[in-house]
Amino acid sequence: MNGAQWVVHALRAQGVNTVFGYPGGAIMPVYDALYDGGVEHLLCRHEQGAAMAAIGYARATGKTGVCIATSGPGATNLITGLADALLDSIPVVAITGQVSAPFIGTDAFQEVDVLGLSLACTKHSFLVQSLEELPRIMAEAFDVACSGRPGPVLVDIPKDIQLASGDLEPWFTTVENEVTFPHAEVEQARQMLAKAQKPMLYVGGGVGMAQAVPALREFLAATKMPATCTLKGLGAVEADYPYYLGMLGMHGTKAANFAVQECDLLIAVGARFDDRVTGKLNTFAPHASVIHMDIDPAEMNKLRQAHVALQGDLNALLPALQQPLNQ
């Protein structure tokens, strides 16, 4: 089995049955291997379209989207899609061909440092430097894309490694993503909720990404709390929920925006306080204490200082915050 065949084998092992791409010289061995079957390839007219299609596939299926491109202009055309996937927390694995290893750094035909270009718009980027590390890198790419806050990962594979043959062993890896449960902070948040007179729930796209919609709806059923959603959070709160105020922000409803400005406790769940929602940060929810719940520690206190920051799985945090109300 050569490297290109192993790439397709690794895709099948990850449960991938559809990829999006545009062929070119440096990735041609992988395209040859795709003829072996088991993975459907959908030809796009541009590599950016392939990246966007992979994003749409991931959104619609909950699986990791995969896009494929050649070296040079093929790889650079993926960048906009990778940046979109990073900002929207979409799991995508981008596989790019690269010039053969001896030619890297020589300004060879269609050689671009895609590893360097992609660092700012991916969770992680890999350059495969030997056939033997290909199984590990393919396994880690999918783990990194899906773990914690999801996002895009790029795997750059030189053409000579795609063509090299050898006996490769399967690699099984799982990224450790265990987060210590914030017991003290949860207790503090419970006390704030118990004292609040006008609490408000601010729901972002992280709820859906965490598959925490059922937990959120149970929390709302127990608290009868007014709720508003961001654009990406739409659908997390049922439209017929009696205390649902619609979308928040620049393009949101008057009711949602007025309510946030008057609340005394704002619970942000999987939301990031972006400018389309807040406008001027120093005038957003001016009377509110803030509880911020998110899987990504980088979002905590990034834009709005939280009185209590709860980092962790929303499926654990929401029931924990709700527990005293049940009792």
Curated annotation (Swiss-Prot):
Gene3D superfamilies in UniProt: 3.40.50.970, TPP-binding domain
Function: N-terminal pseudogene fragment of this gene. If the reading frame is restored, catalyzes the first step in the biosynthesis of branched-chain amino acids.
Gene: ilvG
UniProt name for this protein: Putative acetolactate synthase isozyme 2 large subunit
Binding site for FAD: 149, 251-272, 294-313
Pfam families xref list: TPP_enzyme_M (PF00205), TPP_enzyme_N (PF02776)
CDD domains assigned to the protein according to its UniProt record, in alphabetical order: TPP_PYR_POX_like
Organism: Escherichia coli (strain K12)
GO-annotated molecular function: magnesium ion binding; thiamine pyrophosphate binding
Keywords assigned: Amino-acid biosynthesis, Branched-chain amino acid biosynthesis, FAD, Flavoprotein
Quaternary structure and interacting proteins, as annotated: Tetramer of two large (IlvG) and two small (IlvM) chains.
Pathway entry: Amino-acid biosynthesis; L-isoleucine biosynthesis; L-isoleucine from 2-oxobutanoate: step 1/4; Amino-acid biosynthesis; L-valine biosynthesis; L-valine from pyruvate: step 1/4
Keyword Nucleotidyltransferase in annotation: no
Cofactor note: Binds 1 FAD per subunit.
Misc. comment: E.coli contains genes for 3 AHAS isozymes: ilvBN, ilvGM and ilvIH. In strain K12 only the Val-inhibitable ilvBN and ilvIH are expressed; ilvGM has a frameshift that disturbs the ilvG reading frame. The ilv02096 mutation causes another frameshift which restores the open reading frame, permitting the expression of this isozyme and can be seen in entry (AC P0DP90). Restored IlvG is Val-resistant and is expressed in K12 strains having what used to be referred to as ilv0 mutations.
Spans traversing the lipid bilayer: none
InterPro entries the record matches: DHS-like_NAD/FAD-binding_dom (IPR029035), THDP-binding (IPR029061), Thiamin_PyroP_enz_cen_dom (IPR012000), Thiamin_PyroP_enz_TPP-bd_dom (IPR012001), TPP_enz (IPR045229)
